[in-house]
C-alpha cells in the first residue's frame, strides 16, 4: 500500500492522480522508471540531488510531500470513475486543512477538474485556495504524458520560483 508523505507546514504537497501498477507493486510513489517526477523536482531545485522512489521519505527534509487523489491502482488514470475523483478531492481538502502546506500541486488538469468540480482549468496557480494553501495545477510527469522533460521542468519551475519569492 502506498502511504502519504506528509507533515505539518510543508512548502508544497505534490498530489498525484493515483498509483500506477508499478508504483503499487514497488510500494513507492512515482516508481515507474518512465515517470519523470523525481527528475523534474530535482532539475527545478526542490531536491539537492536526484532521489529514488525508495528515498521518498527524504522529501520531508526538503519541505515537500506527496499524496494522491485516489488510492486505487490502475494501468491508466482514465480508468478512475467520477465519484472516485470527487471523493478524492474532498479527501485532499481535508488533508490540506489539517497539514496546511504553503502550496498544493495537483498533477493533472483533467483530474483536478473532475476532483474539484471546476470546468475550466488552466495550468499554474489557481484562484482557489484551501485555507492558506495555494492551489496549483501542473502537468503530470507520467511517461504516458507526451510533455517533454524540458516543458515539465518549466511548469514546475514557476511553482518553485513563487515559493522562493514568498519565503
From Swiss-Prot:
One of its GO terms (biological process) is base-excision repair, AP site formation. It holds the Pfam family UDG. It catalyses: Specifically hydrolyzes mismatched double-stranded DNA and polynucleotides, releasing free uracil. It comes from the Bacteria. The keyword Signal does not apply. It is found in: Cytoplasm. Its EC number is 3.2.2.28. GO terms for molecular function: DNA binding; pyrimidine-specific mismatch base pair DNA N-glycosylase activity; uracil DNA N-glycosylase activity. Keywords: Cytoplasm, DNA damage, DNA excision, DNA repair, DNA-binding, Hydrolase. GO terms for cellular component: cytoplasm. Belongs to the uracil-DNA glycosylase (UDG) superfamily. TDG/mug family. HAMAP family: MUG (MF_01956). Binds DNA as a monomer. Excises ethenocytosine and uracil, which can arise by alkylation or deamination of cytosine, respectively, from the corresponding mispairs with guanine in ds-DNA. It is capable of hydrolyzing the carbon-nitrogen bond between the sugar-phosphate backbone of the DNA and the mispaired base. The complementary strand guanine functions in substrate recognition. Required for DNA damage lesion repair in stationary-phase cells. This is G/U mismatch-specific DNA glycosylase. It comes from Pectobacterium carotovorum subsp. carotovorum (strain PC1).
